[in-house]
Design a protein with these regions (language model features):
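Non-catalytic interaction/Regulatory regions outside core domains
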Residues: 1-132
Length: 132
């Protein structure tokens, strides 16, 4: 089992933290937001107050490692299709979104399964502010 640590990038620290917290403020159906570094570290994690995680830390870590591999695969198609904006998987209990922030960072967001598409639009708006 790999050790899960949290680090902070000094120049982006408050910006990334604010991004996660602002995503949780979008709607009560947003359960979780995290920024995960491609080298394997959780930089920030925010979970809605009163909720318990559905995955333990190791399962969450492995899930994001797999997401990084999938984003690498998507980049191979970028020339033909253009850059991917996000990826989404709908499970019985939640929807899980991943967003490519830059070459080093992935944003993960989990919502309740009945969350509507307006939440996604608002997340994309918040990301566009971060990536400017």
């Amino acid at each position: 089992m790999q050790k899960i640590t949290r680090v902070h990038l000094h120049s982006e620290q408050s910006q990334l933290d604010k991004l996660c917290s602002s995503i949780l403020e979008i709607d009560p159906k947003v359960r979780y937001a995290t920024v995960f570094a491609r080298h394997g570290e959780f930089l920030y994690e925010h979970i809605r107050k009163g909720l318990s995680p559905l995955l333990d830390k190791e399962q969450t870590y492995r899930s994001f490692q797999q997401a990084i591999m999938r984003w690498s695969s998507r980049q191979l198609l970028q020339k033909q299709l253009g850059p991917a904006k996000y990826a989404m998987a709908e499970y019985e209990k939640v929807k899980r979104y991943t967003f490519y922030l830059d070459v080093h960072l992935i944003l993960g967001v989990t919502t309740d399964v009945d969350a509507n598409g307006k939440i996604l639009d608002k997340i994309l708006e918040r990301i566009s502010v971060y990536t400017k």
